[in-house]
Regions:
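Conserved anion-binding
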Residues: 17, 59, 75-76, 86-172
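Hydrophobic faces of well-ordered beta-strands that scaffold small-molecule active sites
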Residues: 4-9, 33-35, 56, 64-68, ...
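Conserved, mostly hydrophobic/aromatic
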Residues: 18, 25, 36, 80, ...
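Catalytic cores of alpha/beta
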Residues: 22, 74-82, 120-132, 177-195
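Glycine-rich, proline-tolerant flexible connector loops at the mouths of alpha/beta enzymes
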Residues: 33-50, 92, 140-146, 201-204
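C-terminal helical cap(s) of enzyme catalytic domains, especially alpha/beta-barrels
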Residues: 105, 188, 202-219
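A short alpha/beta connector and helix-capping loop motif
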Residues: 41-73, 77, 184-200
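Structural motif
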Residues: 28, 59, 83, 108, ...
Length: 219
């Protein structure tokens, strides 16, 4: 079994203190910083552009796990790579040529992730699983933080684990959306090894980030 890693979503951070919030995550044992990038078009919200990521990366040694919810995604891959993204995750619905976008991210020396919305089936990406580093399973409809976890997506994680075994391929399975101390356990049991969490990490136990990260890791 892979080591459980935590990728806190800064969508739930105090944006007026973003640099300090990332420092707290680093000190609290976060494995990645999860950055949700939204364009108001592919999803109904607007968030973080490349200059913000570039500024935040200057004083941070943790890898940036950048989730691009933008369309057309291909034209923005270079900008987010240059800004400091270490992992770039894209949606198959947001690119005209998923194979080409995966290739571009790899050529830039970045790890590549592909995200599945709650309604997107695993077979959409089955031919690409040997070319990617990570599959991100969305357990809410993307666009806003603080939504309720959708347990029905766990079947996709189990399906991915089965494919890994049958085809002898390896990639991380990340889950994002409504993750808390209760459902993190069933997500891990299903086969997820990276948990994205925002509200639980920043708001639970009076904002005790280290405690909250430790609790999620030991689910």
């Amino acid at each position: 079994m892979k080591k459980i890693q935590i990728s806190p979503s800064i969508l739930s951070a105090d944006f007026s203190q973003l640099g300090n919030e990332i420092k707290r995550l680093e000190e609290g044992g976060a494995d990645f910083i999860h950055v949700d990038v939204m364009d108001g078009h592919f999803v109904p919200n607007l968030t973080i552009g490349p200059p913000v990521i570039k500024a935040l990366k200057k004083n941070c040694s943790i890898k940036f796990d950048v989730h691009l919810m933008i369309s057309p995604v291909h034209k923005y891959i270079d900008a987010y790579s240059e800004a400091g993204a270490d992992i770039i995750t894209i949606h198959p619905e947001a690119t005209e040529d998923l194979s080409n976008s995966i290739k571009k991210i790899k050529e830039l020396g970045k790890k590549v992730g592909v995200s599945l919305n709650p309604e997107t089936k695993v077979n959409v990406i089955i031919d690409y699983l040997d070319k990617i580093d990570l599959v991100l399973i969305m357990s809410v409809n993307p666009g806003f933080g603080g939504q309720k976890f959708m347990p029905e997506v766990l079947s996709k994680i189990k399906e991915l684990k089965k494919i890994q075994k049958e085809k002898n391929i390896d990639f991380d399975i990340e889950i994002d959306g409504g993750i808390n101390f209760e459902n993190s356990k069933i997500a891990i049991e299903a086969g997820a090894n990276i948990l994205v969490s925002g509200t639980t990490i920043f708001k639970s136990n009076n904002g005790a980030i280290k405690k909250n990260i430790d609790l999620l890791k030991s689910s």
